[in-house]
Structure formats: structure tokens, C-alpha cells
UniProtKB/Swiss-Prot annotation:
Pfam families: ACCA
Domain CoA carboxyltransferase C-terminal: 46-299
GO CC annotations, alphabetized: acetyl-CoA carboxylase complex
Stored InterPro entries: Acetyl_CoA_COase_a_su (IPR001095), ClpP/crotonase-like_dom_sf (IPR029045), COA_CT_C (IPR011763)
Keyword Acetylation: no
Record keyword Nucleotide-binding present: yes
Function field: Component of the acetyl coenzyme A carboxylase (ACC) complex. First, biotin carboxylase catalyzes the carboxylation of biotin on its carrier protein (BCCP) and then the CO(2) group is transferred by the carboxyltransferase to acetyl-CoA to form malonyl-CoA.
Protein name: Acetyl-coenzyme A carboxylase carboxyl transferase subunit alpha
Species of the source: Synechococcus elongatus (strain ATCC 33912 / PCC 7942 / FACHB-805) (Anacystis nidulans R2)
Length: 327
């Protein structure tokens, strides 16, 4: 049997001090083994320092750095989470109008024995796969496929679980010709009408209308290092300052992090990620997600269909409310 292939880690810029420390630990171990010297005490101190440094780095990430984590090539995807948390699931294809968009996937499954419908944006793992899935940017056919599956869920009384991970809806000429804006708008309208619980989770990046197309729900959840924004920081910087190089400044101003959105009352719960991000321990992350989804589903299933629709409507009506000073 062939030995398992170990993937080379993909490092982010701000992780370099940590990597240098870990490489130093490895070098000391190697030298100690070659020379039969006991340096266990020194290694123990360095390992403790590495853990502390990792904790310091990931607890003080800037919005721009969180975007890097949200876009990490090995961050768990929609299909990763569905396969990890579901008892079983069957992917369903097509919008029944000649399209099957691979950038938006969905199907029927079971979560803790309960039938549900899963939906989500799907990015690729490498360049070839990303081209196939259009980098997670869904077309009108993708949103119409999502609507078909959500209508199926509503008809048979199955909760809807959506996973958001897209830089935005596909903005090509072909998408506009096929009615991208209309497809997203119809989804927004219909999601307010459904009588089943809807849980929306931002698992990576939630970009603009592309995220909203499957983002109207009774609860909005976000992973700790995910982002949710009206426009990418690069696009925002290009529009406001005519300089994409100011993306970090735009990321700060846009209030895109889970912490920011929780303070603004947009987000219902932040799902904690393992130290180092979701990609560092995907199975642990998936189990955390599963527990949170089950808890919220239990709360929502205690409500009548009319209560669900009314609370969902009021949740979105209250977004953007602010008070002006009388001074």
C-alpha cells in the first residue's frame, strides 16, 4: 500500500514568524537526534511559545488578514461540510431550464436523522477545478437551481441549510443576458415566503448579491474568520479611491468581519474556528457547525410557519436602522 501523500502547507504572509519558529524546532530536534543530546526542555519551551504565538496572531487579525483566511485554498467548502455533517445526502442537478451550474450545489440529505435540503456555493481546490466551478461565482441558472430545491424543501416541509462562499455572482455578459439580477431578486422574494426554517451560514467569503441570493434566512451564522460584504475590498478601493492597492483600508471601513457584523446586529452567531483557521482542523470545524445548526433548528422548529415568516420579515426590516442625535 502506497504511503499517504502529505500536502505541502499553504502559508499566509502573516504566518511567517510562526513558520520560522516551527522550522527552528524541527532543526533542533534533528540535531539532537543526530548527536544524541537531550534537549526536550528547550523543545518544550519552544513548542509552548509556538502555541502562544499562533494564538496571538489569530486573535489579532486585521480585516484584510481575515479575508486571506476566508480565501485560503484549503478552507473547507460546501461539499466538505455537507459530507462531514450529514448522515447521508444526494446531490440534485439542474434548474429544469437547460442549466446545471457547478458553482452552486445542492441536494436532499439528513442531519441527525432529519430530512433537510442543503445548498451552497462551491469553489474549486485547484486552478482546473476553480475554472470548472467558476471560482464559486454562480450564474442565473445556479440561483434558479437553488430556488427549485428550496421550493422542493418548502413543499415537503424540510428545513433549508445554505452555505455562503462566493466573491459575488458571476458578472459576465452571458449572466446579464440570462437575467442575473432577476434570478437573485426572485430568490430574495421567495425566501421570505417559505414556511420552513432557513439557516444561512457564511463559511468563507460572502460577496454582494451573490451571497444574498441564498442568504435570506431565519438565522445568519458566520465562521470566526469568514467575511460578509457588499463589495470586495479590492472593488471598493477601486471605486472610492481609484486604487485597488487601498484594499486593506477598504476592508477596515466596510465592517466585513463576523465581530463587526455581530455588533451591528446583522449576525446571529459567530462559530468559533480552531486555532489556525478552519483549514487547520476541518473535521473539528464541521462538528462545531453541526452542533450549532442542530441547536438553531430546534429553536426554529418550535415556531409555527406564520411565526417563522413574520420573524424573518422583521429581522430584515430592522437592518440598517439607526438613531440620529437631536444635537
Amino acid at each position: 500500500m502506497a504511503a499517504p501523500v502529505t500536502k505541502k502547507p499553504i502559508l499566509l504572509e502573516f504566518e511567517k514568524p510562526l513558520v520560522e519558529l516551527e522550522e527552528r524546532i524541527t532543526q533542533i530536534r534533528t540535531l539532537a537526534a543526530d548527536n544524541q543530546v537531550d534537549v526536550s526542555g528547550q523543545i518544550q519551551q519552544l513548542e509552548a511559545r509556538a502555541i502562544q504565538l499562533r494564538r496571538e496572531i489569530f486573535s489579532n487579525l486585521s480585516p484584510a488578514q481575515r479575508i486571506q483566511v476566508a480565501r485560503h485554498p484549503r478552507r473547507p467548502s460546501t461539499l466538505d461540510y455537507i459530507q462531514a455533517i450529514s448522515d447521508e445526502w444526494i446531490e440534485l442537478h439542474g434548474d429544469r431550464n437547460g442549466s446545471d451550474d457547478l458553482a452552486l450545489v445542492g441536494g436532499v440529505g439528513a442531519l441527525d436523522g432529519q430530512p433537510v435540503v442543503f445548498l451552497g456555493h462551491q469553489k474549486g481546490r485547484d486552478t482546473k477545478d476553480n475554472v470548472l466551478r467558476n471560482f464559486g461565482m454562480a450564474s442565473p441558472g445556479g440561483y434558479r437551481k437553488a430556488l427549485r430545491l428550496m421550493e422542493h424543501a418548502d413543499r415537503f416541509g424540510m428545513p433549508i441549510l445554505t452555505f455562503i462562499d462566493t466573491p459575488g455572482a458571476y458578472a459576465g455578459v452571458s449572466a446579464e443576458e440570462l437575467g442575473q439580477g432577476e434570478a437573485i431578486a426572485v430568490n430574495l422574494r421567495e425566501m421570505f415566503r417559505f414556511s420552513v426554517p432557513i439557516l444561512c451560514t457564511v463559511i468563507g467569503e460572502g460577496g454582494s448579491g451573490g451571497a444574498l441570493g441564498i442568504g435570506v434566512g431565519d438565522r445568519l451564522l458566520m465562521f470566526e474568520h469568514s467575511v460578509y460584504t457588499v463589495a470586495s475590498p479590492e472593488a471598493c478601493a477601486s471605486i472610492l479611491w481609484r486604487d485597488a492597492g487601498k484594499a486593506a483600508q477598504a476592508a477596515e471601513a466596510l465592517k466585513i468581519t463576523a465581530r463587526d457584523l455581530k455588533q451591528l446586529g446583522i449576525l446571529d452567531e459567530i462559530i468559533t474556528e480552531p486555532l489556525g483557521g478552519a483549514h487547520s482542523a476541518p473535521l473539528e470545524t464541521a462538528q462545531s457547525l453541526r452542533q450549532v445548526l442542530l441547536r438553531h433548528l430546534k429553536d426554529l422548529q418550535a415556531l409555527s410557519p406564520a411565526q417563522l415568516r413574520e420573524q424573518r420579515y422583521q429581522k430584515f426590516r430592522q437592518l440598517g436602522v439607526f438613531l440620529e442625535s437631536s444635537d
